[in-house]
């Protein structure tokens, strides 16, 4: 069976926000070109089709509703092939959030398999790395803020801070150019093809040299994210790793 690791310019300035899935607010991100941070500048970019992205990460409350409807994903029932022993470790119980997992805080301790199942149940999917990075390149004022030293430093400062013991609610920061919150400064997030940008053939590109392997050294935050994703397995869960869903702009995801 294929490993999850392997299985893995903007065109229009207008921002459109709609709830493609009932009760879920999503922002429209125009298509564009994306170059993986570890890919040489001489290599072609990837074209990304327009898509809809959740404005905030999935919350504890939303994921609680999912595991209630699908008991196989409850923390005391989930297969260890699909999630490690830390799965939903902040929750007080299989169907209880508790003080370390506020309802409107982002759900963490969720594996790639569980995150994908949640999105699929909604008629959505996990974003690709290209989609996520394209959306995350936007600052509050610019659709590509990566050349803004002040904004880039703000993002880097978050990566240097220790993880809080209790995560705040989602949506508390200023939205970016597309109306999306929390792409930086709250939690790391799963993508569908995690680790793919750190692979060349069958060899993983290890990141001991920091940003020296990056196609664009100024985009060091993206390199950090790619390095982090490359260390994961599909069943991995951590206390600072959550997710959000996307849908195809032309219609609901299959």
Task: State the predicted function of each range.
Residues 2-130, 137, 229-254:
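Extended beta-strand/loop cores of jelly-roll/beta-sandwich
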Residues 28-29, 93-230, 234-239:
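Functional-site microenvironments in short loops/helix caps that host divalent-cation chemistry
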